[in-house]
Swiss-Prot record:
PANTHER family xrefs: PHOSPHOENOLPYRUVATE CARBOXYLASE
Obligatory cofactor(s): Mg(2+)
EC number per UniProt: 4.1.1.31
Pfam families, alphabetized: PEPcase
Protein name (record): Phosphoenolpyruvate carboxylase
């Protein structure tokens, strides 16, 4: 049975009603704030945009004064935000509704568990599956926390709208509350005055744990085990979802991430989870008023009660309460020790000790007629302890390979081993490094030579990691990632630094060494690099000590910027095939960490389809993927959305593991040969323009708001690793962000159309082959669907206005090249899909874009005019911030940024 997406079953009329109410309130509030003639211009702008009268729209925007721009920009930035909230509420309602009526939908957990239960190895699959969303703080989260808090209030009110319609809630009060929060939003700064610090990013991430993850993850795990049990599958230690974190440990290109921020990130996480445990234990304490006059308790609970300092005469017979008081006291003492290094009483040594005490309570209840008390909060607390321990989320450390090389070169020189390490050949480097790792037990940094700031900083981070692992548990830091990994020596250099602080030795590795292959070239050579690594007896011991898993991270953003969307997707697909095969050859479980962004140009797109279209056998039982700054709020802003999106991750991974489609086994040889041919041409088309056209650099920087984005206070990390003098030096995130703002969406489609058109023109029958690929190959279907979505969000009329910002005619002429490829791509996509219009298979998104597009199209024209005035020197520094407001509004309307 073919299941539809949950979004496409939603009640669009309710969303439209809510949007109408929100729009009327926003208009009324804005009307009271503005002069009548200014407010009238807002109405005129909406009419012109709805009619697609872009010339009239441009004329009216040009006539606006700088002061008028302030409120008009705010109005059109807030409107798409309110629409987003309404859609999110509708999705949350639909999730609950479909579950309550037991209706299947694509990715539903119960449907997936039922499917896997039929397999002989069902218990093995479900027991070992582990999907890890890794939260990052890439500089694309444009919303301030204050704005997020306000939108959460509106979200809560809109959830009550159906009750208002039924007369179950006072309509006037509901309406006035809604108005009040919209009015506060209208008068609140939408963007940050100052750039975020890493500490701010850590705090912001923790808000999502408090609002959603701490509710959704244990609940999903409980449901996962319950559904399996219903099919006779007894799962013991299953953890389908655990959490990862980059904030505080990802120092690639971010000089503000240090040993101090790593420690702060870990201890902040610890504080959040310990507070959660404290609160949950207290709730149980309040509930469990069971008396031994009525029911008995186990011997172990009696002993816990005896040790308790809760000596109230009123609780002499309430042994569960006394035992829980003892548990809570230990949790509080443990928190004080872990965070403040202070011993204040009996504490837990490990999270497992805490878990054992809770199990003692559970077993006593089971033995003494208290089965019903174990459901709900109690069982979810047990799941939380298993999942989160005392550390909450595993923090990754990441640094660029060039930094590791510089540090190792300095160590070798100061220790008198080699003075010119960086000048050695790859083979010579590896021989030298292996000798140090295998034969020399000494610590190179023990020398009295003064260390450079770079080396001292890196060693301090690794030393802090070791201390945190000893204190909070080994899982607090599991991986250390090498950005721009190109060779075996890159991996061994990191091992040298880890050896310095005792995180690796000749027998084991306390953290996994994870290469990140990012560019097209590095992905092409990744098989060779990993073959050399897996051939090492030393590496085999390290991998064995990590339960025979070897993780490899794949970079979607840089490979896209390097070779275009089609080339990136296909190179990543083939790399996974090759790396999976080499893992099987060496008897190692190769798992993948997908470095996806929020946009298609950075590997984004619908999560379920992305996972289920991965190569055959590439998902063993673990998969990790980044959840980037700008989409965390959309996907995990509340517990319902979080549950749904986590459910999609788990179901997709299971379905890909168990589904052996005919297309997987019979089609690759023919289809892959076609893809190789088409991709080679697409790569050349993309590279010829981006890196081969001497005017392209100027076109990009003059026809986009990249300069404003670079100064936008949306993250702690700089927009580039170094001074930008070429496209290659620009980070992938502002690269994609800028193209989104100018509505070209270039990274998500350029080079796709012409390469397929040339293939079709070679033989009239080739279009039928491509249609067959689209119908029967999940990878190809996902690829084209993403291009379809990106094209639907682009607007080449608006893109032309941005092109006019270029002064040189030769530079400006690049627009025609881009436009021609856009039209070719659209025609080819529709021809292969067999559709007459874009988004034919996604009516929910189409409807959403149809009623939001007119509003944020206006923001593009306002942004264009502001950029022109800025370049003419007509804006004050305060007025220049208006450009940032438009950036915020457009990103909100598109529902992604970088």
């Amino acid at each position: 049975m073919s299941l539809q997406k949950l979004e496409n079953s939603s009640n669009k009329s309710v969303v439209q009603e809510e949007v109408l109410i929100l729009t009327e309130l926003l208009e009324d509030i804005t009307k009271n704030m503005l002069a009548p003639e200014t407010f009238e211009k807002i109405i005129q702008l909406k009419e012109l945009s709805t009619q697609e009268d872009y010339q009239g729209l441009n004329r009216l925007v040009t006539s606006l004064s700088n002061d008028e721009m302030v409120y008009i920009s705010r109005y059109f930035s807030i409107l798409p935000l309110l629409i987003n909230i309404s859609e999110d509420v509708d999705l949350a309602y639909e999730i609950n509704h479909q579950n309550n009526i037991d209706q299947d939908y694509l990715g539903k957990l119960s449907t997936t568990i039922k499917l896997v239960a039929e397999k002989e190895n069902a218990v093995e699959i479900l027991e070992h599956l582990n999907v890890v969303p890794v939260l990052t703080a890439h500089p694309t989260q444009v919303q301030r926390k204050s704005m997020l808090d306000l939108t959460n209030h509106i979200h809560s009110l809109l959830r009550k709208y159906r009750d208002v319609k039924l007369g179950l809630i006072n309509k006037d009060k509901w309406y006035n509350d809604l108005r009040r929060y919209i009015e506060i939003i209208m008068q609140t700064d939408m963007i940050r005055e100052k750039k975020l610090k890493v500490t701010n990013e850590i705090t912001n991430a923790m808000e999502y744990y408090n609002s959603s993850f701490l509710k959704a993850v244990p609940h999903l795990t409980t449901e996962y085990k319950r559904l399996a049990q219903a099919h006779g599958l007894n799962l013991k230690q299953a953890k389908p979802i655990t959490m990862g974190m980059w904030i505080g440990g990802d120092r690639d290109g971010n000089p503000f991430v240090t040993a101090k921020t790593l420690k702060q990130s870990a201890l902040t996480q610890c504080e959040v989870i310990m507070n959660y445990y404290d609160k949950k234990i207290y709730q149980l304490y309040r509930e469990f008023s069971l008396s031994t006059s009525i029911v008995n308790v186990s011997k172990q609970v009696r002993e816990m009660a005896r040790q308790s300092k809760d000596n109230s005469i009123y609780r002499e017979k309430e042994l569960y309460r006394r035992a829980l008081f003892d548990i809570q006291s230990k949790i509080q003492a443990t928190k004080t020790y872990l965070i403040e290094d202070e011993e204040v009483g009996t504490r837990y040594e490990t999270a497992n000790d805490f878990y054992k005490d809770l199990i003692a309570i559970r077993d006593s209840l089971l033995e003494n007629k208290g089965e019903s008390l174990i459901s709900g909060d109690f069982v979810e607390l047990l799941q939380a302890v298993e999942i989160f321990g005392f550390y909450l989320a595993s923090i990754d450390m990441r640094q660029d390979s060039s930094v590791y090389e510089a540090c190792v070169a300095e160590l070798l020189k100061s220790a008198g081993i080699h003075s010119r390490y960086s000048e050695l050949s790859e083979e010579e480097k590896c021989d030298l490094l292996l000798k140090e790792l295998e034969e020399d037990p000494r610590i190179l940094s023990a020398t009295h030579a003064e260390k450079s700031e770079l080396l001292a900083k890196e060693l301090a981070i690794f030393k802090t990691a070791r201390v945190l692992k000893d204190k909070l548990g080994d899982d607090v830091i599991r991986q250390t990632i090498i950005s721009h990994a190109t060779s075996l020596s890159d991996m061994l250099e990191l091992a040298i630094l880890l050896k310095e602080v005792g995180l690796v030795d000749t027998e084991r590795a306390r953290v996994q060494i994870v290469p990140l292959f990012e560019t097209i070239e590095d992905l092409d050579h990744s098989e060779e690099t990993m073959r050399k690594y897996l051939s090492l007896s030393l590496a085999k011991k390290w991998i064995d000590s990590r339960n025979n898993y070897q993780e490899i991270m794949l970079g979607y953003s840089d490979s896209n910027k390097d070779g275009g969307y089609l080339s990136s997707c296909w190179t990543l697909y083939k790399a996974q095939q090759q790396l999976t095969a080499i893992g099987d050859e060496f008897g190692v479980k190769v798992t993948f960490f997908h470095g996806r962004g929020g946009t298609v140009g950075r590997g984004g797109g619908p999560t379920y389809e992305a996972i289920t279209s991965q190569p055959l056998k590439s998902i063993k039982d673990r998969i990790r993927l980044t959840e980037q700054g700008e989409v965390i709020g959309n996907k995990y802003g509340n517990k319902d959305a979080a549950y749904y999106n986590l459910e999609m991750l788990v179901s997709a991974a299971i379905n890909r593991m168990i589904t052996q489609k005919k297309s997987d086994t019979n089609t690759p040889n023919r289809y892959e040969a076609i893809m190789d041919q088409v991709v080679d041409r697409s790569y050349d088309i993309y590279r010829d323009l981006v890196f081969g056209n001497e005017h392209f650099y100027d076109y990009f920087f003059e026809s986009s708001p990249i300069k404003a984005i670079s100064s936008f206070n949306i993250g702690s990390r700089p927009a580039a690793r170094k001074t930008i003098t070429e496209i290659g030096g620009l980070r992938a995130i502002p690269w994609v962000f800028s193209w989104s703002q100018s509505r070209v969406m270039f990274p998500g489609w350029y080079g796709v159309g012409s390469s397929f058109k040339e293939f079709i023109n070679k033989n009239p029958e080739n279009i039928a082959i491509l249609r067959d690929m689209y119908q029967n190959w999940p990878f190809f279907q996902s690829l084209l669907s993403n291009v379809d979505m990106v094209l639907s969000k682009s607007n080449m009329n608006i893109a032309f206005e941005y092109a006019k910002l270029c002064e040189d005619e030769q530079v400006k002429a690049i627009y025609e090249t881009i436009l021609n490829e856009w039209q070719v791509t659209k025609n080819v996509i529709l021809a292969i899909e067999g559709h007459d219009e874009l988004l034919a298979d996604n009516p929910y998104l189409k409807a959403s874009l149809d009623y939001r597009m007119p509003y944020f199209n206006i923001l593009n024209y306002i942004q264009l005019e502001l950029i022109k005035r800025q370049r003419r020197g007509e804006l004050s520094s305060d007025q220049e911030r208006l450009i940032h407001i438009t950036i915020n509004g457009i990103a909100t309307g598109l529902r992604n940024s970088g």
